């Protein structure tokens, strides 16, 4: 695989779980650095090679290549306890984490964030969002309210006072708003100091480092988390995550300028999935959903929750392409559709007897959208061993071609199985 780019952004173009980790791992074989720019350990990126499956939640997916610098950017939120546990887990699998670095400007997740996340979700009753309860939202809320504590604050001479003041403030919320017992200072503080000692030598100025790499003509891969349809501003609000998931945030979340981003690849699953609450017009309510769920192993990598299954929604995909700045697409879990005689794709919505071609802003309107389908012939053939686009059955080729025609964005490649080797480029600029 050749590469003519200095910077490449990989984003999810649906509701997350598209297989970004696998594709990031694939491109990281030629990268000098992989940088996470948003989210926290609510992500669950799965990478499979040498008959072994690995998961990373906050560490970039390039960690499996020892030659790659893996940087956790300033746009993320970091639970040091989770990060240290992930480092230990990788080390136990003989995977070095000496190449993992952390932005000094990244905000931290503490025990009070995870507790408040849980209490808020319980308080929503029937209006639950489906949060992972890992403290992501409350940490970003503190960042916006300027209560947040950053990695760089850990070395401040008065950090203990800063920490206590922050804990006291949150204990007021925990006890008086939610009637829950307060958190203990000593336990949380001592654990934090222990974990800080384990990572302090890997803290860097992310923007300075990444800008220098690009200016030196190194190849930097920016790894997104979740998906554009979960973006806090442009996703299906309020059933979204707490950060910006589009390529627009790759520069903000790493400390470089927007002109340093050259290309954006959107990862799209061959069908739709969604975790938690929120509308999904193409959701399948028949036994077929269970069949596809089992074939695609569609269970949350962090929570184990079964994912909701739907036909590929091209209205939502076109929206994600526009909002996410996507130049090319990469199709994943293509083989999951191998056994289907007929395959549907959604090309428009019907809302109040009108045909619309974009996602409405209002969630209640989105819930009322009816999908308008185009039906394609399936291929009913195992494609897991093919190694080129030309080897695909004609109907599988037609599936890719028809999507391209409708969304007017080309496919860079596709995946026909979980292993790194089952990733195939369509002829183009990345060919050897």
From Swiss-Prot:
Disulfide bonds: none annotated. Its EC number is 6.3.4.4. It is found in: Cytoplasm. Substrate binds at residues 301-307. The keyword Nucleus does not apply. IMP binds at residues 17-20, 42-45, 132, 146, 226, 241, 305. It comes from the Bacteria. Mg(2+) binds at residues 17, 44. SMART domains: Adenylsucc_synt. The keyword Flavoprotein does not apply. GO terms for biological process: 'de novo' AMP biosynthetic process; IMP metabolic process. GO terms for cellular component: cytoplasm. GTP binds at residues 16-22, 44-46, 307, 333-335, 415-417. Its cofactor is Mg(2+). Belongs to the adenylosuccinate synthetase family. Homodimer. Plays an important role in the de novo pathway of purine nucleotide biosynthesis. Catalyzes the first committed step in the biosynthesis of AMP from IMP. This is Adenylosuccinate synthetase. It comes from Mycoplasma capricolum subsp. capricolum (strain California kid / ATCC 27343 / NCTC 10154). The lineage of its organism: Bacteria, Bacillati, Mycoplasmatota, Mollicutes, Mycoplasmataceae.
